[in-house]
Regions:
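Bacterial N-terminal signal peptides that target proteins for export
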Residues: 1-8
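Active-site-adjacent structural segments surrounding the nucleophilic cysteine of cysteine proteases
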Residues: 25-27, 148-244, 299-301, 312
Length: 364
C-alpha cells in the first residue's frame, strides 16, 4: 500500500539510539499512544523561492493530529543530487500560541557541499529536540512543517518523495492486543551481519540493521543495488552532531533514497503489530534496551537496534542482533523471550524503522 495523506489506524500507526555499548538512558517509557501520518503530495504546500539564494521553502500550514501529542519524530525520503540538500523545521501551537520553529535536521546524500546533521542547543520553555525528536512540555494537536530545498551551485534542487510524521502522547495508555498467531512459526530470510565484523563497527547497530534489511529486499526484488554493505550505510547516515550513525530518520532516509523504496520512523502499540509485519513480509527494525532484551533486570542505558525476522511456534520473537561476537560463539540470529522483547522495546516507546517497496501491501 502506498500511503497517502491520512492517519493510519492505531494497528499500523507506526529518539535516536546508540548501539549496544552506547547511551540511551533518556529514552525510557511508560505506555504511550502513537499515531502516524505520511505525506507524499506537497502540491498544497505554500512554495516560496528566495531569488538571491535559490532556496525554496515549502510551508505546510497547520496540520492537526487526531489526538493531543507531546512527541514528534519527522522522517523523510528524497532524492538529493550532488550539491543539494534539505532542511526540516517544525513548530507547534500550544494554548493558541505558536512556538518557535525547531530544527529537526539537515540532510544530504553527499556532504561535500551540503550538511547532514541534527541541530543541537534548542531547549526553551516550550520544549527541546533530542537529536531527532521534538519533545514538548505540554501536549498539542497542531503542528506546522517547514521544509527548505537547498540548491546546488548549478541551481538544481532535491526532490521530496515522502515525509512521515510520527506523533506520540507519552501519558496515554494503549490496551494490549491479542497475538497474531498467523506469524508464529514464520521466519523471513533476512541476511545476517555483525557490526563487530567491521573496524569502527561497535557503534553501528543501526546501519548494520538497515544493511541487513536492504539486502533482504535486494534478494527478494532482484535488485542488487539495494545490497549495500555496512560501511556504506554507516558513511551515508553519519550525523556529525550525534556524533555517529544512530540518527533514526537519517537511517530510514538512506533506505528511502533508492527509487521505488520507502523508509520511515514510527511507533507501534503492541508486539502483535510486529507479527503482522512479519506475515506481510516486512522485517521491522526496532529500537530496544540491549540489557533488558538479553534478560537483565534493569536497563544500563545501552540502546540498541535489532531486526525482527520471525516468531517461533510458541510466539517467541526471532531477531537478527547485529551485536554478535563471533569469536565468543555469538550468533546474529537469536530467539529471545517474548516478555523480554516487549519490555526492551518499551524503552524506545516502541520505535520502529519500516523499510519496504513503496507499493508493498500491508494490512491496516
Amino acid at each position: 500500500m502506498r500511503i497517502r495523506k491520512h492517519l493510519l489506524p492505531l494497528a499500523l500507526a507506526m529518539l535516536v539510539s546508540s548501539c549496544a555499548m552506547g547511551n540511551d538512558s533518556s529514552r525510557r517509557s511508560k505506555d504511550s499512544s502513537p499515531g502516524f501520518r505520511a505525506l507524499t503530495d506537497f502540491s498544497a504546500f505554500l512554495r516560496t523561492t528566495n531569488r538571491t539564494t535559490g532556496e525554496v521553502v515549502l510551508d505546510s500550514g497547520w496540520i492537526r493530529a487526531s489526538f493531543a501529542w507531546d512527541e514528534l519524530v519527522v522522517s523523510w525520503n528524497a532524492q538529493t543530487p550532488i550539491g543539494t540538500g534539505l532542511k526540516f523545521e517544525v513548530r507547534a501551537m500550544i494554548q493558541k500560541r505558536a512556538t518557535k520553529f525547531y530544527g529537526l535536521g539537515l540532510w544530504a546524500d553527499d556532504t561535500a557541499e551540503q550538511r547532514r546533521e541534527s541541530v543541537v542547543g534548542q531547549k526553551d520553555e516550550d520544549g527541546d529536540v533530542l537529536t531527532d525528536t521534538l519533545v514538548l512540555r505540554q501536549p498539542t494537536d497542531q503542528m506546522q512543517l517547514r521544509i527548505t530545498l537547498l540548491p546546488a551551485a548549478n541551481g538544481s534542487l532535491p526532490t521530496l518523495k515522502l515525509v512521515g510524521l510520527s506523533f506520540l502522547n507519552r501519558n496515554a495508555r494503549v490496551a494490549p492486543q491479542p497475538p497474531l498467531k498467523e506469524a508464529w512459526g514464520k521466519s523471513l530470510p533476512v541476511p545476517e551481519r555483525s557490526q563487530l565484523s567491521y573496524p569502527g563497527g561497535r557503534d553501528w547497530c543501526s546501519p548494520t540493521s538497515v544493511s541487513m534489511v536492504l539486502s533482504y529486499w535486494a534478494r527478494r526484488l532482484n535488485r542488487p543495488e539495494l545490497d549495500v554493505d555496512v560501511p556504506g550505510v554507516a558513511a551515508g547516515v553519519f550525523d556529525v552532531n550525534w556524533p555517529g550513525t544512530g540518527n533514526w530518520p537519517f537511517n530510514t532516509a538512506f533506505a528511502g533514497r533508492f527509487p521505488g523504496m520507502q523508509g520511515f520512523v514510527t511507533r507501534l502499540s503492541d508486539i502483535a503489530e510486529l507479527e503482522a509485519l512479519v506475515v506481510d513480509g516486512v522485517p521491522p527494525i526496532i529500537s530496544v534496551s540491549y540489557d533488558v532484551l538479553h534478560g537483565r533486570a534493569t536497563d544500563q542505558g545501552n540502546g540498541h537496534l535489532v531486526v525482527v525476522v520471525g516468531f517461533t511456534e510458541n510466539g517467541d520473537p526471532i531477531v537478527n542482533d547485529p551485536w554478535a561476537r563471533f569469536e565468543k560463539g555469538d550468533k546474529v540470529r537469536q530467539v529471545v523471550p517474548r516478555a523480554n522483547l516487549v519490555r526492551a522495546w518499551a524503552h524506545s516507546r516502541r520505535t520502529v524503522y519500516l523499510i519496504r517497496p513503496e507499493a508493498w501491501l500491508v494490512r491496516q
